């Protein structure tokens, strides 16, 4: 068997080739993810939460969308709130509850993170706009199915 990725992918099923591709893509992005940061610097979890908060959301909803435990989200929220990226406001639909929303700094930071992450993804993946759209649809479908049975242990950290 050859060490060539092309040769390896042609010798296995589409399912295995897909898993190998996603695995390599994940680790290459993980390796370079710290290039995507702001001032003040944010942790990986803080960046993930900031990007996930496109619109105001309750913490439970955000935890579910991020496939994280609510207690983990609370710690991240406290940190981002201290850095003036997010704020807690009363939920207009339920005055007993709070929701999270981006501050002006948070909106600017989120926009910068999304742009930098998109550029990094295009560079690493080599996919064009149409391929990215198709990949995003397929990956979202696979993610939804994968999370039906609960949050994988590795995502809880």
Identify what each model region corresponds to.
Residues 1-40:
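N-terminal leader segment of winged-helix/HTH proteins
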Residues 17-20, 48, 133:
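Active-site phosphate/pyrophosphate-handling residues
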Residues 25-36, 66, 109-131, 142-153:
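Alpha-helical linker/hinge and terminal dimerization helices associated
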């Amino acid at each position: 068997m050859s060490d060539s990725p092309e040769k390896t992918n042609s010798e296995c099923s589409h399912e295995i080739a897909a898993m190998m591709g996603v695995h390599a893509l994940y680790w290459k992005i993980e390796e370079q993810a710290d290039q995507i940061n702001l001032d003040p610097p944010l942790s990986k979890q803080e960046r993930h939460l900031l990007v996930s908060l496109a619109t105001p959301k309750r913490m439970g909803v955000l935890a579910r969308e991020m496939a994280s435990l609510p207690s983990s989200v609370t710690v991240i929220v406290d940190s981002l709130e201290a850095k003036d990226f997010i704020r807690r406001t009363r939920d207009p639909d339920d005055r007993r509850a709070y929701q999270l929303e981006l501050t002006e700094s948070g909106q600017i930071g989120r926009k910068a993170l999304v742009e930098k992450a998109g550029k990094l993804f295009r560079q690493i993946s080599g996919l064009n706009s149409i391929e990215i759209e198709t990949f995003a649809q397929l990956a979202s479908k696979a993610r939804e199915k994968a999370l039906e049975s609960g949050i994988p242990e590795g995502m809880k950290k």
